[in-house]
Design a protein with these regions (language model features):
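RNase H-like polynucleotidyl transferase catalytic core
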Residues: 86
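ATP-dependent carboxylate-activation loops
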Residues: 83
């Protein structure tokens, strides 16, 4: 399949999160990343904007009754930046996880503006 956008990880937060997950979860995450890269319109059950943030999205991973989230955002429309992930244990996404992702997004833009 041809890619319509590029997905990259910022720093090592996503990689660290990914390595701690079971292989089945890693495979599901890779499948969703592939969908984000290749589908022009990504289904909301894979990628959803987070209300109350400035451009933050969460990639949604479900396997059985367990749920994982990976935060990301778009840079220049076709570049998706993966930030951090967590295991979701409550209905609502924890505010501290959103705040961490927002700090990472700010850090990404600060680093980008330096170069």
């Amino acid at each position: 399949m041809e890619k319509v956008r590029q997905v990259v990880a910022y720093q090592n937060h996503f990689e660290y999160f990914l390595k701690k997950q079971p292989v089945k979860v890693q495979n599901k995450i890779f499948k969703i990343i592939e969908a984000i890269e290749t589908l022009e319109k990504v289904p909301a059950n894979y990628l959803k904007s987070i209300r109350g943030t400035k451009g933050l999205y969460e990639s949604r991973i479900k396997l059985g009754t367990d749920i994982w989230r990976v935060f990301c955002f778009f840079d220049k429309g076709k570049l998706v930046i993966l930030l951090n992930g967590f295991v979701k244990k409550f209905q609502k996404t924890p505010k501290k996880e959103i705040e961490k992702a927002e700090r990472l997004m700010e850090s990404y833009y600060a680093d980008k503006n330096k170069s």
